Amino acid sequence: MKRPVTGKDLMIVNMGPHHPSMHGVLRLIVTLDGEDVVDCEPILGYLHRGMEKIAENRAIIQYLPYVTRWDYLATMFTEAITVNGPEQLGNIQVPKRASYIRVIMLELSRIASHLLWLGPFMADIGAQTPFFYIFREREFVYDLFEAATGMRMMHNFFRIGGIAADLPYGWIDKCLDFCDYFLTEVVEYQKLITRNPIFLERVEGVGIIGGEEAINWGLSGPMLRASGIPWDLRKIDRYESYDEFEWEIQWQKQGDSLARYLVRLSEMTESIKIIQQALEGLPGGPYENLESRGFDRKRNPEWNDFEYRFISKKPSPTFELSKQELYVRVEAPKGELGIFLIGDQSGFPWRWKIRPPGFINLQILPELVKRMKLADIMTILGSIDIIMGEVDR
């Protein structure tokens, strides 16, 4: 590290791992010249639990409850990636009803994750008021999750070939009501936050990342889309049934903290659009127990159609992963969440490599905070959106 020409003594400051703005057990060793950041070194690993090694000693159905502990604020995505890999290896078809319900759950999870990013991000830069409004909306999402899965967080809802249970009676109407209500709340956030001159002063031009730089660092998700690159795996990979809905990729050109905020805010409205279309076009309609209707062959033969069944033929707990390699990925709220899976003709995966978006997005932090003020570290770190459970695994 070069000594600045000012000749002043440098000060080394420890931020974290118990700092309230650290969003988990992240530690930063920051070298300061007065208020200016000269160098920053992130120290990781405080929350490492060996998730990749645990996967090698568990069948997929046993491993599902573990994966919700990676990104514990967007657990549906970790579940989706865990079942998508074996489904592709085993060529297992998912009924359209299950696929639609998965999309609804994924997008609700995206909204919950973005809300839980927005509240603390605003608190980090000195705006406490929106925090309480934002958490009120997040509670509504968790109420919907609790009604459908039995758990507010750590849902354990996805299964190989479908989902664990059908939607309960009245859930679809509740979810549609939430969608209508939430759209008005997003407008309120924009009035309260987006045009606030103090907020703009803190985020505009702070932590700028160019498009080419974002690609070179391997960034993904809102970090990449805020730098002028409209890349979204839901459009590119067309997994689940995303290509059956009308929605737009949200992106910005500026590449600063404000652009990342705007991308996430507009992504929430796009998620609502997708949820509304999925609820209205749900195969089988708003009935609550299609599986039992399927047994009633004489009276209702149409319920036996594959697309109406909410779950396909269940694979056995000793479902074997064929001997091949596979990389699967989904567009999680924080970026590209991927799994490199190697099967070995046994019930356990031979290798289970996790590609966490937060870990890779965090690598650019030292580059962004250099030559910035100490107070800007919290703004930049908050705009990256990390969860340490996913970073350390």
Curated annotation (Swiss-Prot):
One of its GO terms (molecular function) is NAD binding. The keyword NAD applies. It catalyses: a plastoquinone + NADH + (n+1) H(+)(in) = a plastoquinol + NAD(+) + n H(+)(out); a plastoquinone + NADPH + (n+1) H(+)(in) = a plastoquinol + NADP(+) + n H(+)(out). InterPro entries: NADH_Q_OxRdtase_suD (IPR001135), NADH_UbQ_OxRdtase_49kDa_CS (IPR014029), NDH1_su_D/H (IPR022885), NiFe-Hase_large (IPR029014). It is a peripheral membrane protein. GO terms for biological process: photosynthesis, light reaction. The keyword Phosphoprotein does not apply. Disulfide bonds: none annotated. One of its GO terms (cellular component) is chloroplast stroma. Keywords: Chloroplast, Membrane, NAD, NADP, Plastid, Plastoquinone, Quinone, Thylakoid, Translocase, Transport. It is an enzyme of class 7 (translocase). Its EC number is 7.1.1.-. It is found in: Plastid, Chloroplast thylakoid membrane. NDH shuttles electrons from NAD(P)H:plastoquinone, via FMN and iron-sulfur (Fe-S) centers, to quinones in the photosynthetic chain and possibly in a chloroplast respiratory chain. The immediate electron acceptor for the enzyme in this species is believed to be plastoquinone. Couples the redox reaction to proton translocation, and thus conserves the redox energy in a proton gradient. NCBIfam families: PRK06075.1, PRK07415.1. Belongs to the complex I 49 kDa subunit family. Folded specifically by a chaperonin Cpn60 complex containing at least 1 Cpn60 beta 4 subunit. NDH is composed of at least 16 different subunits, 5 of which are encoded in the nucleus. Interacts with the chaperonin CNP60B4 subunit. This is NAD(P)H-quinone oxidoreductase subunit H, chloroplastic. It comes from Arabidopsis thaliana (Mouse-ear cress). The gene is ndhH.
